């Protein structure tokens, strides 16, 4: 097989593009998670004022990840990004217990959005490397995740800093893309 036929074969089987929306409160670790996925330097991260987009190849998919800032003043603009979302990844700071109620409210509002109806959701219980982090099971219970019936969902413990648990979550994403794709 010559080089040209190899290139033609590669071109004929392009990766399926997947639009992923990465949301969560400010300081939850969304950008760190995104940079970890893209194998980029995570030593200097500042709060996201608008949004970041990165494309990551994984298991035959081209994952186009939209990381939107989580500050309170930016959250009303989240809805501008809902259209054509294949997977929602919601990041929670597992160590910031004071904000569990706030993050739960934001997640509940997202799950009620018509444009996100039926979209599979992965909840990353981030910052598990911190001693004060609540386990994913406790967060799932506190946010009543077991009541979600209109979509597939998963909660995944992770540390965006160390990368632990991140790949497990992305494996789930790749497995569940097809449940939303028509």
From Swiss-Prot:
It is found in: Golgi apparatus membrane; Cytoplasm, Cytoskeleton, Spindle; Nucleus; Cytoplasm, Cytoskeleton, Microtubule organizing center, Centrosome. GTP binds at residues 24-31, 67-71, 126-129. It is a peripheral membrane protein. It comes from the Eukaryota. Its main location: Golgi. It holds the Pfam family Arf. One of its GO terms (biological process) is Golgi to plasma membrane transport. One of its GO terms (molecular function) is microtubule binding. GO terms for cellular component: axoneme; centrosome; ciliary basal body; cilium; cytoplasmic microtubule; Golgi apparatus; Golgi membrane; midbody. InterPro entries: ARL2/3, P-loop_NTPase, Small_GTP-bd, Small_GTPase_ARF/SAR. Signal peptide: none annotated. Keywords: Cell cycle, Cell division, Cell projection, Cytoplasm, Cytoskeleton, Golgi apparatus, GTP-binding, Lipoprotein, Membrane, Myristate, Nucleotide-binding, Nucleus, Protein transport, Transport. The keyword Transport applies. A lipid is attached at residue 2 (N-myristoyl glycine). CDD domains: Arl3. Belongs to the small GTPase superfamily. Arf family. Small GTP-binding protein which cycles between an inactive GDP-bound and an active GTP-bound form, and the rate of cycling is regulated by guanine nucleotide exchange factors (GEF) and GTPase-activating proteins (GAP). Required for normal cytokinesis and cilia signaling. Required for targeting proteins to the ciliary membrane by releasing myristoylated protein from unc119 cargo adapters into the cilium. NCBIfam families: small_GTP. This is ADP-ribosylation factor-like protein 3. It comes from Taeniopygia guttata (Zebra finch).
């Amino acid at each position: 097989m010559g080089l040209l036929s190899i290139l033609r074969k590669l071109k004929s089987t392009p990766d399926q593009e997947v639009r992923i929306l990465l949301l969560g409160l400010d300081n939850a670790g969304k950008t760190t998670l995104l940079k970890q996925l893209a194998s980029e330097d995570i030593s200097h991260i500042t709060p996201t004022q608008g949004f970041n987009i990165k494309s990551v190849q994984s298991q035959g998919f081209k994952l186009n990840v939209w990381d939107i800032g989580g500050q309170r003043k930016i959250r009303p603009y989240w809805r501008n990004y809902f259209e054509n979302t294949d997977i929602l990844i919601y990041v929670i700071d597992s160590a910031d217990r004071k904000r569990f109620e706030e993050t739960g409210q934001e997640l509940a509002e997202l799950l009620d959005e018509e444009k996100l109806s039926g979209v599979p959701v992965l909840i990353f219980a981030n910052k598990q490397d911190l001693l004060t982090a609540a386990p994913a099971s406790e967060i799932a219970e506190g946010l009543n995740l077991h009541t979600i019936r209109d979509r597939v969902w998963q909660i995944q413990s992770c540390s965006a800093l160390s990368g632990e648990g991140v790949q497990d979550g992305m494996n789930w994403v790749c497995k569940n893309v097809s449940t939303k794709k028509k």
